[in-house]
Amino acid sequence: VAIVNPKMPDSGYPFRDLAGCAVVWKLISALRFACLDVYKQPICLLNARPSNEAYVIEAVKLVNLVEVERISETVVPGMVSISQTRLVPFLQGQQILVWDAATQVRQLEKAFGKGVEFNCYDIATDIARDIPAARGASLLKLKDQSKIARYNGKPIGELDGFLNLFVTFLLRKNGTWGPREAEELQLVALGTLADLMPLRGENRILVRRGLAAMNERPRPGLAELLSRQGLAGKRVTTGDLSWQITPAINATGRMGTPERAVELFLADGPVPRQRLAEEVVRLNGDRKQLGADSWAIVEPLARASLPRFSERLAVAYGAGIHRGVTGIMANRVASAFKVPAVVICLMEDGTAVGSLRSARGFHLDALLEPCADLFIDHGGHAFAAGFSLRAERLDELLARLERLAADARLPDGDAEEELEIDAELPHEYLTPAILDLADRFEPYGEGNDQLTFAARGMKIVAADIMGKAERNHLKLTLDCGKYKWPAIFWQEAARLNRDFAVGDRVDAAFHVARNAFNGTEIPQMILEDVRKVEG
């Protein structure tokens, strides 16, 4: 078995940022594929088509459904024999599959005469049995219906459409996408979001498929956790998962009992799963309290460290910082001070364990790699990483980080404060239908922020302060003409009656979301910023 690590520079894999959980799932899928009859079987797809007064004969060789070689020959009838083309050595010994054999034989006879015989198999009937929409259609028509082709970046030909259709057919025929894979991809989606991997390329496709499967039928264990978090029956988004599900799962590891999350997804029967879901949520509550306690330690340490690290890095370390929340603390420090952050826990066994988080697009490799010889272990990616080392080497690490920070080049910090607006909407566009537009750009997450809209002159017709323990949040009702929108403004309750009040007209930047309550979904805005309209 050869295991490809996409992050290795010479791996040959086309997408470096594939999430670790996706690498594991693809390995499992590859091992399953190796058990199929098609494994290692050479297959050749051939297509002949007229082109002006000539014929174009194209063929592609596949091994394990991956293209390994292709040729294209343009033949003017009567000008060359088949032996003068590259077709004979290319096709020799191949299992040749065609679409609509009768038509293909006619085209080949016109190109080379009736003295040339091609032994080929018409796969069209087999494919139409599994994909009825393909029955009776030409490759010219089918190529434009290929979903795979949407990711090609350029228009595809008939042979490419044939190839995509054949791959889809074989995968369906062999049951490589079914309930089992739907459940597995839900875990891949959760892992990709939890690991803060960029939602581009394969990550985006895998998360989208996992999210769709989750909304159709959440897997055992996840269903109970969704219910416990008030998400049962709701159309779940990546935002819901990132805020309410992955933190709860991660909390089991942060609190030293990662096996609880594993048991939740493996348990038989609703009763043990319900009990485990309750325990996972409880552990997440404990983690939140631990985070609040740790922040009281971390924040002043990080603030005091800024001068030492040239105002380009914030560092906090100490025995009072719990190992399970170093990542959360580093993320919070980076957000608070707008610089990369390092938070380190001093362990009882004489080691120091740290987490790094990026800010302003800074790649953490520039901090990690020059210190690699100090670490017992380290890993992660450009924007989130971790390490461990012997505690006696901590001073040496801090000295190196001090030098590295002095030379670090961070993008202008002011850019962080700018809001990028995707579209300004007139009031007549502010209908619930705007949610359907936003849905098309899912999945949102790292590398694919939610669409941010702006609207001007909306009247505040109601305002309420919200919050359980601390009433820090604001709920406004904005009059947009035909519709009045509920609008949530997190952590901004203090701005009511200071920057704006009921009756004022405001300009606002926001994204749109659904608030599910008692089985009903209510459109709402999540405000990013609000500015009172003067005059």
Feature locations, PLM:
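Short glycine-cluster motifs
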Residues: 127-131, 144-146, 342-358
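Short glycine-rich, Thr/Ser-proximal phosphate-binding strand/loop in the N-terminal lobe
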Residues: 59-77
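A structured phosphate/pyrophosphate-recognition subdomain
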Residues: 2-44, 48-57, 61-65, 125-126, ...
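Short, ordered loop/turn segments at secondary-structure junctions
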Residues: 1, 7-9, 101, 124-128, ...
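Flexible, glycine/threonine-enriched loop-and-boundary segments that flank and lead into catalytic domains
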Residues: 304-331
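Conserved DEDDh/DEDDy metal-dependent 3′-5′ exonuclease domain
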Residues: 1, 72-133, 155, 159, ...
